[in-house]
UniProtKB/Swiss-Prot annotation:
It comes from the Bacteria. It comes from Bacillus cereus (strain G9842). This is ATP-dependent helicase/deoxyribonuclease subunit B. Despite having conserved helicase domains, this subunit does not have helicase activity. Heterodimer of AddA and AddB. One of its GO terms (molecular function) is 4 iron, 4 sulfur cluster binding. ATP binds at residues 8-15. Binds 1 [4Fe-4S] cluster.
Amino acid sequence: MSLRFVIGRAGSGKSTLCLREVQEELKQRPRGKTILYLVPEQMTFQTQQALIGSEDVRGSIRAQVFSFSRLAWKVLQEVGGASRLHIDEAGVHMLLRKIVESRKDGLSVFQKAAEQNGFFEHLGSMIAEFKRYNVTPSNVYEMWQQLDAHSSSAEQKLLANKVYDLQLLYDDFERALIGKYLDSEDYLQLLVEKLPQSEYVNGAEIYIDGFHSFSPQELEIVRQLMICGARVTITLTIDEKTLAQPVNELDLFYETTLTYEKIKQVAREEKIEIEKTIPLMEQPRFHSPALAHLEAHYEARPNEKFNGQASVTISTAANLRAEVEGVAREIRKLVANEKYRYRDIAVLLRNGESYYDVMRTLFTDYNIPHFIDEKRPMSHHPLVECIRSALEIISGNWRYDAVFRCVKTELLYPLDVRKETMREEMDKFENYCLAYGVQGKRWTSEDPWMYRRYRSLDDTNGMITDSEREMEEKINRLRDVVRTPVIRMQKRLKRAGTVMQMCEVVYLFLEELDVPKKLEELRIRAEESGDFLFATDHEQVWEEVMSLLDTFVEMLGEEKMSLSMFTDVMSTGLEALQFANIPPSLDQVLIANIDHSRLSDVKATFIIGVNEGVIPAAPMDEGMLSDEEREVLGAAGIELAPTTRQTLLEEQFVMYQMVTRASERLYISCPLADEEGKTLLASSFIKKIKRMFPNVKDSFITNDVNDLSRSEQISYVATPEVTLSYVMQQLQTWKRYGFEGNLDFWWDVYNFYVTSDEWKQKSSRVLSSLFYRNRAKKLSTAVSRDLYGDIIKGSVSRMELFNRCAYAHFAQHGLSLRERDIFKLDAPDIGELFHAALKKIADKLLRENRTWSDLSIKECEHLSVLVIEEIAPLLQRQILLSSNRHFYLKQKLQQIIFRTSIILREHAKSSGFVPVDLEVPFGMGGTGSLPPMEFSLPNGVKMEVVGRIDRVDKAEDENGTFLRIIDYKSSSKALDLTEVYYGLALQMLTYLDVVTSNAQMWMKKGQAASPAGVLYFHIHNPIVEMKGDASEAEIEKEILKKFKMKGLVLGDADVVRLMDNKLSTGSSDIISAGLKKDGSFSARSSIASEQEFNVLQKYVHHTFENIGKDITEGVIDIAPYKMGNKAACTFCNFKSVCQFDESLEDNQFRTLKDMKDSEAMEKIREEVGGE
């Protein structure tokens, strides 16, 4: 029994010495005693390859490469102990979830924390850490007693409570495992116990290579190996000079020196002979003097400069994607020009979550074979999502999101259907469910679902059409496709008494859906498309899910569990599933995490993402215990994993390992922006390297090749897939500025695409975009007539929409596009309810020959309740009756109608104007409808402007009859003459024109009428702020002011007083007008003369004629207006259709100048020739 150390700096040949010794021993004595070669898990494959890579050693039974966990399996199979069921990480998380749920009421700190994402991952890691550091539940309990007895501050009490919770959960976890199961850490503990019994290990020659430190648990394994083995050789990365000095935590080799001393101490305790340490002083790894210099002087202060030709490249990139593309181009160059193999190259990084997806895509595009040494979660696979969402459907009462997450896995589809057809049908089915608010009991009820193409209050009495009946049948068929397997599962789960029976139900659910066959189809399809990685995913996921169900049954099979807990435990297990990495092929670029990688035999290393806070890593408090709490526990005798401070001290060693992996070339790069464009800073580590290599110039990587030299641009010509985008860049440049003579090689590249049989058709679609202009071509007269008909019949809002943006008008009224109908109460619905409610009250008053002024407060309240109750069942598929939230909203709406009724009552008392009619139609046909506003357009097409007027009021005096328009709005609104001039606000003046023009035909006495004005009435229930103790009368007066109607009224004092008979001087509380003492109007009055009203009405006609002419002539320009901070695009539903983009030459806003009303009025006069 002896111990031997092989030490040396990085690249000194420690592993090579050990491997050569083993190979020589195998060559001399192939059947001798066992040789164990122990390495970290991630080194096993490459070490195995290196061991048998010699010409003299092509295979061996005597020498085996193990990690600690694999050695545990080997020993337990030999001496016993492997019969207990292994539970993996998913099983651990499931068991912990069950324990936490059952312990929840007794937990102090973790009761609420258990609901947070990642809690069980952190808890599992904490328990694993306890085990690795030989901390038992009783140790934790004793620590809690100690902390609880001496905790005085809030922080101390929090730690005591946290430790209490941990010991409870840890103890329960260990009790659940004892005698039945083993987790990964238990195998190592069993290995410690069983090693003395192993004949396989007894007397073996043991090599331990690639480690920098050992946990207490691993150190105990090393102890037993030294006792059992003939000789143990351990390699450590240490400079021999360091051993001659006192240990200092700032030393580069501090961690490995501590490990050296700990192992020597163990050897002394066990009376193991310690052989003479073998120090390796040479640097055989480095073929580059620059890299040898970097290794030898890495920790030197001040930095030792290297003035020769350096094989170190430092780059900054415009963004993360540009950085990865730069790496890909350089890799291709190394392989093509320097005769590198892909396996000679490694890419190291730390923040893989930001890079891996981009690297998979780009390396595939550049035809670079690669292996990403990182396990991917299975959580996004359709099978995992199908199980999780199906259980959520059942436990969560059939919520919409859970149902359609399950649908979109496509595993509910029948096996024999055409996927594309079913996908399209399900999209329409989802639209139906959204529009009708389908969830909960409606899914499980046997009542058939109904389909009607209506939404407004006016469309509720229509008969069902054939198309509606056909759609209804399809919807009910699709409903059964979705619900039948889930309801069957739901019924079985209700009958299931134990976890085993529940797991059987899940298995039956998958089998009856033919999931294995569907996964096989997905696998075949992936293989046919050349995506072999995803092909194996479909195989793995089924095996892992079956294994998870088996583990669940083994652990908790006979226990009874509620459906909600079963769902939570199953979801926790599914979240922990990961795809196993397929071992790399013989020739691939290795992409690995800096912290976990153990590389050997690479010629070139690319270290990417070297940004501040990433390399070196910024301090982060993660996990169950903070740094301060770990230090408290450490001081009390419980050793745990290093704190953030200790980790930061070790960071220099990590970076040293990182830069000393390659033998010939080192590339260091960082992006200046992430994928979202957020600025990133280069790491201080880059500055250190620059100081060591002052001759190295910092290069810049960009995806814009225009500013690069010819030789640099040529490097961007790579595979056809990636080069096409750069050809497009150059052609765009040529299109604008012309090519420079020395860049004409891009024409050669272009000619490749247009002449290649393989790429001609593919590239034509891309290259055609070079001449793409985002302009809407004018419609022909024939197409325009097909779309809009021989008679254009449109509302005023349609005309206004055309003036806001002609393309939006085309999308809505030409193509009949509309947003997906969703079961929610929108502003139009609320507006519709307000209009209907006020009309019903007004109609009732007309029938009873009463006016608003006749109502009492109590009657206002009674009527508001009555009409809302009557309307609610008819609005938006009974949305106001669909939930408690909507019922509350119904009450709020009723209060608004009540308040509005009170205000209308007050207005009626103060006004000589009385309502003539409400919801007055024009151009609608039928009795009571006024004629439309008609136009004969120059091209022979007729146009009718139609609509419905909220309210028309009439007043009479000795000067005649006056009519005014009241428009109910659910938001504050005023009439802006600038918007009238630009055709953006035509509604009120159109209504006024319609009623005054048709007054003689419409009014009962057949008399003519003059315009009195147009006013907006804001329907709301305002909150007012009052100072001091205000009386109820004062509050009501202030509320009345909040209902002041804005708009434009006739500049006649008598007419204004008819609108507010309480007005003598000052401002009116009812309308936006006021009188001075001399009888003239105040400056803030919104007034117009009768002549000006006539001009405005003429201008409205003029504007409609222009709009009609443009519509019929096929104008569909993508030209939205912009005026100040208002723009047509702000609330437009068609932005994704028109693709309006200000960066394009053809896409610019029509900028409209904001004007004063007087200036706008003057321009309106000029247009129509008014005086």
